[in-house]
Regions:
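Bacterial N-terminal signal peptides that target proteins for export
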Residues: 1-6
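Acidic helix-start/capping segments at beta-turn-to-alpha-helix junctions
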Residues: 76, 108, 116, 120, ...
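C-terminal motif of bacterial Sec signal peptides marking the signal peptidase cleavage site
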Residues: 13-16
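Activation targets extended, charge/polar-rich intrinsically disordered C-terminal tails
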Residues: 19-26, 124-208
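Soluble non-cytosolic domains of exported or imported proteins
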Residues: 53, 89-93, 115-120, 134-142, ...
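Second-shell loop/turn segments in exported
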Residues: 46-49, 56-57, 107-115, 126-135, ...
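Glycine-rich catalytic cores of cysteine/serine-nucleophile enzymes that process amide/ester linkages
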Residues: 23-24, 35-108
Length: 208
């Protein structure tokens, strides 16, 4: 990494040291367990600034024996999705869409790359995410690349702090498919989490 890049990253990293650990209880994690029924896969989400194309955030959707979202140093959360140190359990299709909707807005697109993998590789990625621990701010790209690097079939993923570099390498993997998510929501998305939580409760009340 160039010295100029390190000079930009290190002050942020040092200021953010001591990531907040979160540990949902066993019963919540067990209750939230979601099996998608889809072939195993790993999906990389990159939040990209529309003006300039800078990668601002990385997250991993791992579809293994259960479907989880590794959202390192992320700010998305939902009351129905228990979290353990940046790993979110119970990622149903609705929650996956909530995650995308939270990040995509008038100033950011969400770029999705999905790669099919064997059940063994998916499970290996899940175990790595479970054991990774809480991630400091500005280390999302670094933690995602840490998890991917060395997985069978992902050897070309570099260890890097930069989400765009992870995305560019991921895009070159065999079988990778791409989708871009656009949204015109205002840049201030502080109310999105409240709306998502409220809409889920309303659906539950209707079903009951």
């Amino acid at each position: 990494m160039r010295r100029s890049a390190l000079a930009l990253i290190l002050p942020i990293a040092l200021a953010a040291c001591g990531a907040e650990p979160v540990w949902a209880p066993d019963e919540a994690v067990t209750r939230a367990r979601f099996i998608s029924g889809q072939p195993p896969s790993i999906t990389l989400y990159t939040v990209v600034r529309k003006n300039g194309g800078t990668g601002e955030h990385s997250g991993l959707l791992i579809d293994a024996s259960q479907r989880v979202m590794f959202d390192p140093a992320g700010t998305w959360h939902h009351p129905w999705v228990p979290e353990r140190n940046d790993l979110h359990y119970g990622i149903t299709e609705k929650m996956r869409k909530f995650y995308i909707d939270y990040h995509a807005r008038e100033t950011y697109d969400v770029i999705e790359y999905r790669v099919p993998v064997s059940p063994e590789v998916a499970e290996m990625a899940l175990r790595r995410a479970e054991s990774y621990g809480a991630v400091n701010k500005a280390f999302c790209g670094n933690s995602v690349s840490d998890i991917l690097t060395g997985l069978p079939g992902f050897e070309t993923i570099p260890r890097t702090f930069f989400p765009n570099k992870v995305m560019q390498a991921f895009a070159e993997l065999p079988g990778a498919t791409m989708k871009v998510h656009h949204d015109g929501d205002p840049d201030n998305n502080s109310g999105v989490l409240l709306v998502q939580a409220k809409s889920t409760v309303e659906i539950q009340n209707i079903n009951n």
